[in-house]
Amino acid sequence: MSGAVVFFTGLSGSGKSTIARALAAELSQGGTRQVTVLDGDEMRRRLWPELGFDARSREMNIERIAWIASLIAAHGGIAIAAPIAPFATGRATARALVEPSGTFLLVYVSTPLEVCEQRDSKGLYARARAGEIPDFTGISSPYEPPDDADVVIDTTDTEVGEAVGRIRAVVERRLSLSADDRARPASDPPATRPA
């Protein structure tokens, strides 16, 4: 039983992490699959703080997150990754890494820049506009909207629960999960031969 990776992309403040955490909670209730959230900020801060925010560092960040997510999917779990993932090449790399191991779903949180700036409680956008934060996505570094997203959600007028419901429906359809599948215990792992 292969798993899935739900890979979010969108600007800072678009709602990616909020929806990702709510989706994880929803998918974990009564399910047999392990659900793991890979938050872009947390992954970067805890695992590879040496990476910068230039284009190459961003690509490396996405590749590393996707590789970890692919391992989770290969073992039948569901990884929910929520980085900004601003470049089409990085998202294509993520898809290529995941698809041999499981289902890849791209969720584009398309909340407009103006709304993201209004939500910015940390003042990151203001600092970026003042030139204090270089390579800030949407201000001094580009964001390339995807044209291949499985789900597109603008959180300007969409509640978290509605967003989660839309994504969950796609996840379940793509994994062919019925209520019976979710209630059934996970199968034993295949036997391995001694080395």
Language model features with spans:
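Hydrophobic anchor at the beta1->P-loop junction of P-loop NTPases
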Residues: F8
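Phosphate-binding P-loop
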Residues: M1-G3
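ATP-dependent NMP and nucleoside kinases share a basic, alpha-helical "lid"
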Residues: R46, E50-F53, A69-R129, D135
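Small-molecule kinase domains that catalyze NTP-dependent phosphoryl transfer to phosphate-bearing small molecules
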Residues: S110-L113, Q118-R166, R174-P189
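Conserved beta-strand scaffold positions in the cores of enzyme catalytic domains, especially
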Residues: V37, F104-L106, D150-V152
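Conserved substrate/cofactor phosphate-moiety recognition/catalytic segment
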Residues: S14, R21-S70, A74
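P-loop (Walker A) phosphate-binding loop of NTP-binding proteins
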Residues: L11
